[in-house]
Amino acid sequence: ASSSAEGIYILGSLNVNVVFNTVNLVSTNTNNIGLHLSGGGAIHLLNNNIAVKGGDALYVHSGLSIDQSDFNNFYNANGDVGYWEDEVKTLSDLIAASGKDSNSISEPPYFYNDTSYQSAQVALNNNGSPVSGITTDIEGETRDASNPDIGADEFSPTSQDAGLYALVVPEMPFAAGSLPVK
């Protein structure tokens, strides 16, 4: 059995800016927490990309003062978004419970691999909000001054020049060997 993990844990702290972070917890342990906040106040959560495959992407205890939370991606591949003084199943539930995160999303980040902070998720690109004093990403690359990316990495997604809409021919079941497709 895998042990539980917490990406970011803040306990009893004041005046904390949690901005432009990426957390990717790949274990399916149901006790994992991507971003855990307990006690304290004047906390600002902006432009974070928090993804888990088990547990909660976000866990906020009661009595905590969060001044701002927005432009985040809270994603759980196998369950609820998290907990905000009570279980929140969806991003809409989180917005209703917190009164915050109206510009946040809950999208799979499409990391290049389990140990990568680099994402291929178009929804993260240019959908953050500028934060005064933060002009570069984790790699030292310049952040977009008006519309930075959500998460630790500023990136430009690859453009799609083609995609599969439908497979018309050959019909299933496929015969063995090489077949032309239409």
Question: Each predicted region: which residue ranges?
Answer:
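Extracellular beta-strand/loop-rich repeat segments of large surface/secreted proteins
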Residues: N31-I33, G39-A42
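Acidic glycine-/aspartate-rich tracts in secreted/extracellular proteins
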Residues: N29, G54-G55, N73-V81, K100-D101, ...
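C-terminal accessory segments
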Residues: L91-E154
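Extracellular/luminal regions of secreted and cell-surface proteins that mediate adhesion/ECM remodeling
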Residues: P157-K182
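Short, T/G/N/S-enriched strand-turn elements that build extracellular solenoid repeat scaffolds
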Residues: L11-G12, G39, V60-G63
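Cysteine-rich, disulfide-stabilized extracellular repeat modules
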Residues: S4, N31, E107, Q160-G163
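Short glycine/acidic-rich loop motifs that flank beta-strands on beta-rich extracellular proteins
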Residues: A1-G7, S27-G34, G54-H61, N78-D86, ...
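Right-handed parallel beta-helix
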Residues: A1-S2, G7-Y9, L14-S27, A42-K53, ...
